[in-house]
């Protein structure tokens, strides 16, 4: 196995060496020696040397306050470099995943070999491909944008060094550049000083588009086209772009008072400005390239006499002028100036598409297909993927905010209190108002600030250019009136089109009721008329797992999707399921291919819409080549799920899942909700309280400032347990339930489920991944250093439970060790542990010092606080996900 990763290991070792030289230059030999000693002790401790483990603990406990930060930074930066090397390895010619685009070819060959599938059926499935990736600014992207950029540059250096033909002097130049970049990273503060604003988050999203997706999407389509031509003799049409990007940055106001209507308006303008900026660069290249004279009569008629000598350039220059005028107008609007709209303002994709496509058709007709299919084709595909808005945005708001707004309106009008009405009365009122021609909102009424904000947001949606807002997502949706209420508020704002409104079902009860809610809605004639045969429903993964534990949540998600698919099919409605997955297992994260194939049959017929969160955006779309790889994996998984759907689970399997769900939920809630020691234990054994100090996302960590675990957002909840390596939310309850079913004599049935049902095997695979990252001795060390002795028995009980869970999962999967079928991931975790362990031990020490200072009423030591933040960021890098 090691041979396969020798290229990765040698890159990691080389980057570590350069980092060591940088530390020596910056801080002297003694600090480097200290870091090296700790690294060697950690390696030996991992290999099972108990004496060296004790020495590691003592060494880190005895660091002076001046040594804390350099040591923490050394290991944290090393993990960032290891992640960079690993990301490069995934796309390098020597890496195992080098040709993920090849995954499409493999899938096409597999499909062609199916006796009941012909080329026409496969072609039809390709043509109906739809993939919408929704970028969210969860506070999980811990790494600063400036460092992400440097990591990208380091990646380029690794690529150049991989070239066997590189001359010695070039190799020296690349190595010098690598040293500069690592030195720049070392001398850059890795922790942000302020929380990012929602606008900063949106700019981070635009940077991903510019640095990676802009090139990655056309490259992916070329790759897809090549594989289709080779395997099916079929070419993609110019306008076929199955990928769209949407963003929650600047649109997601659920529990985030910092996202206001004004912010959303600003982000929409900023997004359009960025689109003009990127398209101007494209057009600049096309003006230079399209110097041809031959053109069709249609194109010559379009350019007239004035443009006859260089018709293509003439059209491109005209388009450039329109883009520049649009950009100037948007710039003025962003500065708050109210300017009249210029003639030819670009607001719709067709305005960009038409002149470009006219050039394309003419070049093809005049025998210049080779030119048409170059830079011009890439730009046309960008128009289809990104277009005038660049990325569309979703608006997300919590259901109670709409209920409160309507309550305020009905009370003012003297017709009662909407908030206290029954569901039937609410629906009757809403349908009556939706059918009414008169406005509901009184003219001179002064609403409260909260209600004004809800109404202003609806006004922003109504005024935005059509197509720039993708959907309105209602979090914590529970009833049909939650959906109708939003439609009424949008109608009152003067919206002139049917905006997709997606209820988000996210607690266990809401998932179980999702089908009833949608059935009631689809039985309302007005509603059926409005949606025109299309419905989007969002399935929440994070909050359901936090509410009931992963096993119960994942089964509720499966059943809700299954029921919704069948209901919509019966009603002739095209359903798009929108998956709100996180990067970590406790928030529904799983490798894309496995996750999609484990969903109910038919769940991808309406395409895939899924959130891509925080740090996962960088891992999956941080480089153009990685983007090609990720999009190819999604494409092959969607094709496979639609053409070779997983089997319907047997009734006996469903009964077992019902049983597992009940037992695991009872176990999970028994600890999290009912054990009086649990919350004090959680608060002391993890850095939960300290996490609030990290300037991560623009969203507060809690939905409400007071309250226990239930008010904590899913992300800090997971993040805290990831830091102390117990990883509790991602497994608690699951193993206990499996053990009980095994004791009931159903092990062989569980083994069959693991073998023949992708849903179940993916669940077990995700548990194995979590178990591989969890660490009993580190979790125990946090307890000893930070937790009151009276709470130690609870910590021991949880660790014993984890050990039992690992045994039962291995027995069902028939494996002797974790991750046996994914050695690449096991290797990656082992590689990191040597550097993550010292950060964990150091973090426990820093938490101890920080809390002691607070207890003594002294002011915090900035060296301790800063080092603590660095360890939190470093462990997140080591675990490859935060929350």
From Swiss-Prot:
Location of the active site: 138, 546
Protein name: Phosphoenolpyruvate carboxylase
An example Gene Ontology biological process: oxaloacetate metabolic process
Enzyme Commission (EC) number: 4.1.1.31
InterPro entries (UniProt xref): PEP_COase, PEP_COase_bac/pln-type, PEP_COase_Lys_AS, PEPCASE_His_AS, Pyrv/PenolPyrv_kinase-like_dom
Origin: domain of life: Bacteria
Keywords: Carbon dioxide fixation, Lyase, Magnesium
Chain's role: Forms oxaloacetate, a four-carbon dicarboxylic acid source for the tricarboxylic acid cycle.
Cofactor names: Mg(2+)
PROSITE patterns, A to Z: PEPCASE_1, PEPCASE_2
One term of GO molecular function: magnesium ion binding
Family stated for the protein in its record: Belongs to the PEPCase type 1 family.
GO cellular component annotations of the record: cytosol
Matches recorded under Pfam families: PEPcase
Catalytic activity field: oxaloacetate + phosphate = phosphoenolpyruvate + hydrogencarbonate
């Amino acid at each position: 196995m090691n041979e396969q990763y020798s290229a990765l290991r040698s890159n990691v070792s080389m980057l570590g060496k350069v980092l060591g030289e940088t530390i020596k230059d910056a801080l002297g030999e003694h600090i480097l020696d200290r870091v090296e000693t700790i690294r060697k002790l950690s390696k030996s401790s991992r290999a099972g040397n108990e004496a060296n483990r004790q020495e590691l603990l003592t060494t880190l406990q005895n660091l002076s306050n001046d040594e804390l930060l350099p040591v923490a930074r050394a290991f944290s930066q090393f993990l960032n470099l290891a992640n960079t090397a690993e990301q490069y390895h995934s796309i390098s010619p020597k890496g195992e995943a080098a040709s993920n685009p090849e995954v499409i070819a493999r899938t096409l060959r597999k499909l062609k070999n199916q006796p009941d599938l012909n080329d026409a059926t496969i072609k039809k499935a390709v043509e109906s491909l739809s993939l919408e990736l929704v970028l969210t600014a969860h506070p999980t992207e811990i790494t600063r944008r400036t460092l992400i950029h440097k990591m990208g540059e380091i990646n380029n250096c690794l690529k150049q060094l991989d070239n066997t033909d590189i001359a010695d002097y070039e190799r020296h130049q690349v190595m010098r550049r690598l040293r500069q970049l690592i030195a720049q990273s070392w001398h850059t503060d890795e922790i942000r000083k302020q929380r990012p604003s929602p606008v900063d988050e949106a700019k981070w999203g635009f940077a991903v588009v510019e640095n990676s997706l802009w090139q990655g999407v056309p490259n992916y389509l070329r790759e897809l086209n090549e594989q289709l031509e080779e395997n099916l003799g079929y070419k993609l049409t110019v306008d076929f772009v199955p990928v769209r990007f949407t963003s929650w940055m600047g649109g997601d106001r659920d529990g985030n008072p910092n996202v206001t209507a004004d912010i959303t308006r600003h982000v929409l303008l900023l997004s359009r400005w960025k689109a003009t900026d990127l398209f101007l660069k494209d057009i600049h290249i096309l003006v230079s390239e399209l110097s041809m004279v031959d053109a069709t009569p249609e194109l010559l008629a379009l350019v007239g006499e004035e443009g006859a000598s260089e018709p293509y350039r003439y059209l491109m220059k005209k388009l450039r002028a329109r883009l520049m005028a649009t950009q100037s107008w948007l710039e003025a609007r962003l500065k708050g100036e109210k300017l009249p709209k210029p003639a030819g303002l670009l607001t719709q994709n067709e305005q960009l598409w038409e002149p470009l496509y006219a050039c394309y058709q003419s070049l093809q007709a005049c025998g210049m297909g080779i030119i048409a299919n170059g830079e011009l084709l890439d730009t046309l595909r960008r128009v289809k993927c990104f277009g005038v808005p660049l990325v569309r945005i979703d608006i997300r708001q919590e259901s109670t905010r709409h209920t409160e707004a309507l309550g305020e309106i009905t009370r003012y009008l003297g017709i009662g209190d909407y908030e206290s009405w029954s569901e039937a009365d609410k629906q009757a009122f809403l349908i009556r108002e939706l059918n009414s021609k008169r406005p509901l909102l009184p003219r001179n009424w002064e609403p409260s600030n909260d209600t004004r904000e809800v109404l202003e947001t609806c006004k922003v949606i109504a005024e935005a250019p059509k197509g720039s807002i993708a959907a309105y997502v209602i979090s914590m949706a529970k009833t049909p009136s939650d959906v109708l209420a939003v439609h009424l508020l949008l109608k009152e704002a003067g919206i002139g089109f049917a905006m997709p409104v997606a209820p988000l079902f996210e607690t266990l009860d809401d998932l179980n009721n999702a089908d009833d809610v949608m059935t009631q809605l689809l039985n309302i004639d007005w509603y059926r008329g409005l949606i025109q045969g299309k419905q989007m429903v969002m399935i929440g993964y994070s909050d359901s797992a936090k509410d009931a534990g992963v096993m119960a949540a994942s089964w509720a998600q499966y059943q809700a999707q299954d029921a919704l698919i069948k209901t919509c099919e019966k009603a002739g409605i095209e359903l798009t399921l929108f998956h709100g997955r996180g990067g970590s297992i406790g928030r529904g994260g799983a490798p894309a291919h496995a996750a999609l194939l484990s969903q109910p049959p038919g769940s991808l017929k309406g395409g895939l819409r899924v959130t891509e969160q925080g740090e996962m955006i960088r891992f999956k779309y941080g480089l153009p080549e990685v983007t090609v790889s990720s999009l190819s994996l999604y494409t092959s998984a969607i094709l496979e799920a639609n053409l070779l759907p997983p089997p319907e689970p047997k009734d006996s399997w469903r009964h077992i899942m019902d049983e597992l769900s009940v037992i695991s939920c009872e176990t999970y809630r028994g600890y999290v909700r009912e054990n009086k020691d649990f919350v004090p234990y959680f608060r002391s054994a993890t850095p939960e309280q300290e996490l609030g100090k990290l300037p991560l996302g623009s969203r507060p960590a809690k939905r409400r400032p007071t309250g226990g675990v239930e008010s904590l957002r899913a992300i800090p909840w997971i993040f805290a347990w990831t830091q102390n390596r117990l990883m509790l939310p991602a497994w608690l309850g699951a193993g206990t339930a499996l053990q009980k079913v095994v004791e009931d004599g159903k092990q062989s049935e569980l083994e069959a489920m693991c073998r023949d049902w992708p849903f179940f095997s993916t669940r077990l695979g995700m548990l194995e991944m979590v178990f591989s990252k969890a660490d009993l001795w580190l979790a125990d060390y946090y307890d000893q250093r930070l937790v009151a002795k009276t709470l130690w028995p609870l910590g021991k009980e949880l660790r014993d439970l984890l050990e039992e869970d690992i045994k039962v999962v291995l027995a069902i999967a028939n494996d002797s060790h974790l991750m046996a079928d994914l050695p690449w991931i096991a290797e990656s975790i082992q590689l990191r542990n040597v550097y993550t362990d010292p950060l964990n031990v150091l973090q426990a020490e820093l938490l101890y010092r920080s809390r002691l200072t607070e207890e003594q009423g002294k002011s915090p030591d900035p060296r301790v606080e800063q080092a603590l933040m660095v360890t939190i960021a470093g462990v997140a890098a080591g675990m490859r996900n935060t929350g």
